[in-house]
């Protein structure tokens, strides 16, 4: 069975975009692959989070993953910093990574522009740490978005370079796994672009009914169509896309017909959309609260996940040490 590895930075709650864009597919993949899902707390250090936020953020993501249906018996969930072998491989890969190629990585240049007062070595060597996360489990596939494709290419480069330097075929080159039709680009509520944490246009899986309604009722609209079957502008198309995800086909068809016949009342549509989003999120929200209140279970899941991940990583590290020439 092929191995799949995927990580998420603990930078806030999961939103509808995370769910339909990735987590929904993670739940299906756990039945088809040997999956390991981790919470990338080391990666989050590049932005210098407060110490008290690191652990609480990791527990939040863990509870939300469980609430969405990831089964830790099928797919271990672990916190990155609990698997120390990753750091050792990160060191070895950094010895074979060159300054020029790291400085040319697009994500590094973008982050350096966004935080000019905090251009740290962690930002520069982000591709090395991401490669270590993947290669330490000798992953076959890694689910990534387009924004991570260059970092995946770096991971393949580091695997090839290690093999060449030590005259071995030890590391396979991990493939990028794109969900394609299985993934859904969930639009934000601000009229353009996709839903995101930093954009402030997201509906979170843990949002209560009142919060969901408030956000949806504030969504950008226009004055309405001025001709029959008019092409929907992006803000309106975004609302219909959300409705397609959470509402019944009959509900979607009703409002779509209303739009095409120039009879749409956006207020009515938003109220229906808010109710349908809440109906979708409610059972997940309840499970999130249930898992968050069970500290003992979260600790157990994280510990067992770390044990499974460490066993996989230790095997790799012992073999890598031997290849390099170190004693185990």
Regions found by a protein language model. Name each.
Residues 2-132, 285, 289:
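N-terminal Rossmann-like or analogous alpha/beta NTP/dinucleotide-binding catalytic cores
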Residues 18, 156-328:
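Conserved nucleotide- and phosphate/pyrophosphate-binding catalytic cores
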Residues 22, 89, 124-127, 151, ...:
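Catalytic-loop motifs flanking and including active-site residues across diverse enzymes
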Residues 99-103, 136-143, 247-255, 285:
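Short helix-capping/linker segments at secondary-structure and domain boundaries
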Residues 103-114, 143-151, 171-176, 253-264:
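Short alpha-helical "patches" and their helix-cap loops
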Residues 110-162, 166, 187:
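Internal, conserved structured core segments that host functional sites
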């Amino acid at each position: 069975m092929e191995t799949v590895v995927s990580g998420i930075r603990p930078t806030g709650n999961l939103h509808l975009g995370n769910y339909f864009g990735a987590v929904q597919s993670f739940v299906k993949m756990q039945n088809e692959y040997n999956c390991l899902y981790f919470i990338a707390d080391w990666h989050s250090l590049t932005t210098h989070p407060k110490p008290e936020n690191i652990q609480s953020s990791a527990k939040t993501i863990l509870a939300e993953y469980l609430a969405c249906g990831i089964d830790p018996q099928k797919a271990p969930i672990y916190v990155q910093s609990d698997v120390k072998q990753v750091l050792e491989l990160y060191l070895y890969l950094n010895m074979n990574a060159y300054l020029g190629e790291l400085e040319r990585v697009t994500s590094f240049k973008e982050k350096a522009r966004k935080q000019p007062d905090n251009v740290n070595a962690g930002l520069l060597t982000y591709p090395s740490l991401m490669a270590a996360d993947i290669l330490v489990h000798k992953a076959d596939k890694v689910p990534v978005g387009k924004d991570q494709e260059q970092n995946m290419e770096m991971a393949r480069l580091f695997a090839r370079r290690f093999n060449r330097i030590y005259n071995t075929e030890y590391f396979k080159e991990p493939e990028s796994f794109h969900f394609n039709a299985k993934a859904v680009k969930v639009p934000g509520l601000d009229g353009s672009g996709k839903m995101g944490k930093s954009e402030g246009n997201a509906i979170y899986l843990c949002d209560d009914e009142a919060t969901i309604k408030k956000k949806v009722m504030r969504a950008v609209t226009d004055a309405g169509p001025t001709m029959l079957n008019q092409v929907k502008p992006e803000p309106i198309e975004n609302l219909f896309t959300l409705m397609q995800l959470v509402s019944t086909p009959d509900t979607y068809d009703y409002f779509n017909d209303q739009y095409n016949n120039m009879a749409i009342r956006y207020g009515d549509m938003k109220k229906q959309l808010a109710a349908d989003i809440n109906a979708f999120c409610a059972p997940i929200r309840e499970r999130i609260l249930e898992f968050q209140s069970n500290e003992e279970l979260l600790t157990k899941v994280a510990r067992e996940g770390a044990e499974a991940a460490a066993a996989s990583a230790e095997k790799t590290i012992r073999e890598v040490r031997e290849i390099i020439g170190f004693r185990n």
